[in-house]
Regions:
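N-terminal cap/lid segment of alpha/beta-hydrolase-fold proteins
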Residues: 1-16
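Active-site loop/oxyanion-hole signature of alpha/beta-hydrolase fold enzymes
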Residues: 13, 20-23, 58-99, 263
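Conserved HGGG/HGGXW glycine-rich cap/lid loop of the alpha/beta-hydrolase fold
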Residues: 15, 21-66
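Gly/Ala-rich beta-loop-alpha elbow adjacent to hydrolase catalytic centers
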Residues: 99, 103, 107
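Flexible "cap/lid" loop of the alpha/beta hydrolase fold
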Residues: 112, 119-150
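Conserved alpha/beta-hydrolase catalytic His-Asp/Glu region
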Residues: 132-134, 152-211
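Conserved serine/cysteine hydrolase catalytic core
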Residues: 187-237, 248
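Catalytic active-site module of serine/aspartate enzymes centered on a nucleophile-bearing elbow/loop
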Residues: 242-283
Length: 283
């Protein structure tokens, strides 16, 4: 593997969880959770930059990446409590959480349920609006009568189809191979249980948003065909202390514009989160 990430496994609540730890001595902690159907290697190209400003811990959430799953964790509310369990396991207090894609609703539930436990959030690219505003494969996954139809999805075709729109911005072949392996067997279909909980979970989240005073940096792709930017705008309009940056990308903003994405995180961690509600930027 050509990545800078040093990966290991740790047992948390009986599950083997894959993680990468920068082992730095910085006073601030940055905890990053994997997007789906990718893995913690989605942060590879910003790892060096971010490890210079904070100690990093990247996690494949249960059921995603290469971590073991447990069915009862496959909803944002349940995953939010597992996120807090991760922080306890690593003895991390007052972290910044970077939770794109499926991590977004879980991170928001964690902030709502544990005021003061999390210093700030960096989120986006995950469905959060209610009524739901989703499209493409995500819409199909949510609206299908069951998950059996997705058991035959070929992982390489799935990953290569997701990466095709970003062309040369796609990661190296060994990282693509990790994404493929992360969805082998029944992993993709079973992980779909998480997004299929959105119709019940997102109305609950919507009611909590005005009471989340944790600073929140939202990063969205302005051309996202799966999770339209209206999801980010929905959050920004309701969160009392948020900033929204819209990048000129599709869904995979963290891959397609990894430099800009990492720069926004760095600026946020270096004090941007202290500024308060700063409106919206487009780049």
């Amino acid at each position: 593997m050509s990545s800078e990430l040093k990966v290991g496994y740790r047992t948390v609540d009986g599950l083997q969880i894959r993680y990468a730890d920068s082992n730095g001595s910085a006073s601030q902690h940055l905890v990053l959770t994997s997007p789906w159907p990718e893995s913690l290697y989605a942060f590879d190209r910003m790892w060096s930059r971010l490890s210079g400003i904070a100690r990093l811990l990247a996690i494949d959430l249960p059921g995603f990446g290469r971590s073991e799953r447990r069915i009862d964790l496959l909803s944002p509310t349940a995953m939010s409590e597992f996120l807090i369990r991760i922080l306890d396991e690593w003895n991390i207090s007052d972290p910044h959480l970077v939770c794109p894609d499926v991590g977004t609703p879980a991170a928001l539930f964690a902030a709502a349920g544990h005021p003061g436990r999390i210093r700030s959030l960096v989120i986006g690219g995950g469905a959060t609006a209610y009524p739901l505003e989703v499209a493409g494969t995500l819409k199909d996954l949510i609206e299908a009568p069951g998950i059996d139809a997705f058991r035959s999805v070929e992982p390489r075709a799935l990953v290569e189809g997701l990466m095709a729109p970003i062309g040369p911005a796609a990661p190296a072949g060994d990282i693509i191979a990790d994404y493929v392996e992360s969805n082998m067997g029944d992993r993709f279909a079973e992980s779909a249980r998480y997004v299929r909980s959105y119709p019940e979970q997102l109305p609950l989240l919507a009611g909590l948003l005005p009471r989340i005073f944790t600073p929140v940096q939202i990063i969205a792709g302005g051309r996202d065909p799966i999770v339209p930017v209206t999801n980010a705008e929905f959050l920004h309009a309701r969160l009392p202390n948020s900033r929204l940056d819209v990048l000129d990308t599709g869904h995979l903003a963290w891959e397609e514009a990894s430099g800009e994405y990492g720069a926004i995180i760095a600026a946020w961690v270096n004090g941007g989160y202290l500024v308060g509600n700063t409106g919206m930027g487009r780049t």
